[in-house]
Amino acid sequence: MVVVVLMSVVILGLTAMFTQTQRAFKAGMTQTDILEGGRMATEMLSRELEQIVPGYATLNLGRTNFYTVQESEFPMNLPANSVAQRTNIVSRIFYLTHENQTWTGIGYYLVPDSTVAPGLPVGVLNRFELSVSAATFGQQPSLMIFNFNRAMVGLSYQGTVSRILDGVVSFNFRTYDTNGYWINPSRATPPLGQITNHSDWSANFPITLYPPRVNYHFVGSAVPAYVEFELGILEQGALDHYKSIPVWLSQSNYLWQQSSRVQVFRQRVSVRNVDRSAY
């Protein structure tokens, strides 16, 4: 009898140990996947953003070099603090790159997951790309951004769209001038470093004025001197639990409490081909 009891205790102890080991192993694998995905996307964005070039297009229609537009924002409660909040912002971005006789338009945008309620910034980060010849770009500078806009709304388009990351809750950008100052609408002329050719640049606040968010549009000879971006990814376990909740309000309340399970990647990139005559 004593032997049976001892064997039962040993078996239960080993089972508990193996269960904890398995849980820790799975958590480590999930964390590794999240970090690797975030690092991959950050490296890809950084490498592309530093290659942004001005298109110098003279046609008024569609001569976009760089633009970002805020899509939505969602506050999340900070851990151990019932007052402070973190606001996740989701934006879309488009920019031009140039290599030899080829112009390429690249855009990133978030597609809400089909299992997630609309209006909440949790979704899949997609990457759009379309390359054209220099001759085609000279005649149709709006071709790439036109197809990017069609791809975003699910219409037929030229180019390719690739799925990059799942569970993205924050995707936001800021631009800076050659002196390192943040470009925003409250900086009217003539503060130091402000772009002087305003026909080639615009920045405006979206509907929400606080905290300050800025939509950017650079055309002609202007591109930002620096681009700072933030990418926030919800951990897989939290994302799976979030998707399993059938009620929109419950989903929202759950997401609001998960700021500690968002992995944030932030980087500031220097644009190599900035035309300083635009500043």
For each feature predicted by the language model, list its residue ranges:
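Aliphatic-rich helix starts adjacent to a transmembrane/signal segment
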Residues: 1-52
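Surface-exposed loop/linker segments characteristic of extracytoplasmic
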Residues: 69-180, 184, 188-199
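Short linear sequence signals and composition-biased patches located at protein termini or domain-edge surfaces
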Residues: 56-59, 99, 157-279
